[in-house]
């Protein structure tokens, strides 16, 4: 018995692993940008920081996954957008700190290497990288029989970006009177899916609920997370934004306070939030308390910006998309977020 046969008999298909690498090369090539050094397949991805032209570079990194949204991708056998979700969760976090994404790495663990399926996953990762301007410079695909079921996989990612030291957004400039501007989300994004799956556990995904404006439930649930990088970078370069909150797990209540000091609070006017139909459906069919929705989901706004009043018009001009003025920064009395 050769080592190869022994490994195959233990459930690891080395040849399938090689096929995955060949299949994903064309997708990785889409993500090339200035600064990338070396080719896919080396022991480490390389990037020449001097190519960015940043005078006082600060590296900002982030890592994340997509939670149990993956279980819906597996259930519905749709794998071509979940990679974009993974990239979005990482790059949206680092752009909130003022970083331009430079490169990305992914990690996929699976019970059985299925090259066609894994190519779809990486194609989604590459699409997310293209949308955010990050190069996909490396990754790992681990076949782990016994750890995962044959149809199961997990996905995580790692993003590294750069910011000028003077352009870092750490919340220290957020001040009383700053205006809170919201940018629309594409849907649920990639958090709260354990609850989402419970609410719709008895649904096939083919249903067209009256709240969903003609779309199938599975299409809405797997709508990829919006990537905000290209919208926000011009604002960061002009130093127009005092704070940025990426509205992910914990919704408004947990994430908005992360962009300002402890003596401040966010006063938000609920009637100015463009609540998406899926959130109305979740609240209705899940019998979820209205206030709790804001503790879990983005409700239709994936990014909240704190902007000085005199800069609001310029920010809206640069964004060239619907921007929602949803509240202001006030002195803290009790709660960090007040939804009125």
Curated annotation (Swiss-Prot):
Disulfide bond entries: none
UniProt catalytic activity: 2-formamido-N(1)-(5-O-phospho-beta-D-ribosyl)acetamidine + ATP = 5-amino-1-(5-phospho-beta-D-ribosyl)imidazole + ADP + phosphate + H(+)
Keyword ATP-binding: yes
Compartments reported by the entry: Cytoplasm
Principal cellular location given in the protein's record: cytoplasm
GO biological process: 'de novo' IMP biosynthetic process; adenine biosynthetic process
Keyword Cell cycle appears in the UniProt entry: no
CDD domains: PurM
GO MF entries: ATP binding; phosphoribosylamine-glycine ligase activity; phosphoribosylformylglycinamidine cyclo-ligase activity
This enzyme's EC code(s): 6.3.3.1
GO cellular component terms listed in the entry, alphabetical order: cytosol
Class of this enzyme: ligase
InterPro entries for the chain: PurM-like_C_dom, PurM-like_C_sf, PurM-like_N, PurM-like_N_sf, PurM_cligase
Pathway(s): Purine metabolism; IMP biosynthesis via de novo pathway; 5-amino-1-(5-phospho-D-ribosyl)imidazole from N(2)-formyl-N(1)-(5-phospho-D-ribosyl)glycinamide: step 2/2
Family annotation (PANTHER family): TRIFUNCTIONAL PURINE BIOSYNTHETIC PROTEIN ADENOSINE-3, TRIFUNCTIONAL PURINE BIOSYNTHETIC PROTEIN ADENOSINE-3-RELATED
Family: Belongs to the AIR synthase family.
HAMAP family for this protein: AIRS
Protein name, per record: Phosphoribosylformylglycinamidine cyclo-ligase
Organism the protein comes from: Streptococcus sanguinis (strain SK36)
């Amino acid at each position: 018995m050769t080592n190869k046969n022994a490994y195959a008999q233990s459930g690891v298909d080395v040849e399938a692993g090689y096929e995955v690498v060949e299949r994903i090369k064309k997708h990785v090539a889409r993500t090339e940008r200035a600064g990338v050094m070396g080719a896919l397949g080396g022991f480490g991805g390389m990037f020449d920081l001097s190519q960015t032209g940043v005078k006082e570079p600060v590296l900002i990194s982030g890592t994340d996954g997509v939670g149990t949204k993956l279980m819906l991708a597996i259930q519905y056998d749709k794998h071509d957008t979940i990679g974009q979700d993974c990239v979005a969760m990482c790059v949206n976090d680092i752009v909130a700190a003022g970083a331009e994404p430079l490169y990305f790495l992914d990690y996929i663990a699976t019970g059985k290497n299925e090259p066609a399926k894994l190519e779809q996953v990486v194609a989604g990762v590459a699409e997310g990288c293209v949308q955010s301007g990050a190069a996909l410079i490396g990754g790992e695909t681990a076949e782990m029989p016994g750890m995962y079921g044959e149809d199961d996989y997990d996905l995580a990612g790692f993003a590294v970006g750069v910011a000028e030291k003077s352009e870092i957004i750490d919340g220290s400039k957020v001040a009383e009177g700053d205006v809170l501007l919201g940018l629309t989300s594409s849907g649920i994004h990639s958090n709260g899916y354990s609850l989402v799956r419970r609410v719709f556990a008895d649904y096939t995904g083919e249903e067209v609920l009256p709240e969903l404006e003609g779309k199938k439930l599975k299409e809405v649930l797997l709508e990829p997370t919006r990537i905000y990088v290209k919208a926000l970078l011009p604002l960061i370069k002009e130093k127009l934004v005092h704070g940025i909150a990426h509205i992910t797990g914990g919704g408004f209540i947990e994430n908005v306070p992360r962009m300002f000091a402890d003596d401040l609070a966010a006063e938000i006017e609920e009637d100015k939030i463009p609540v998406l139909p899926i959130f109305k459906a979740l609240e209705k069919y899940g019998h979820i308390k209205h206030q709790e929705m804001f503790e879990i989901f983005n409700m239709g706004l994936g990014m909240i910006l704190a902007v000085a009043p005199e800069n609001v018009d310029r920010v809206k001009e640069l964004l060239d998309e619907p921007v929602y003025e949803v509240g202001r920064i006030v002195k803290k009395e009790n709660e960090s977020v007040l939804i009125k």
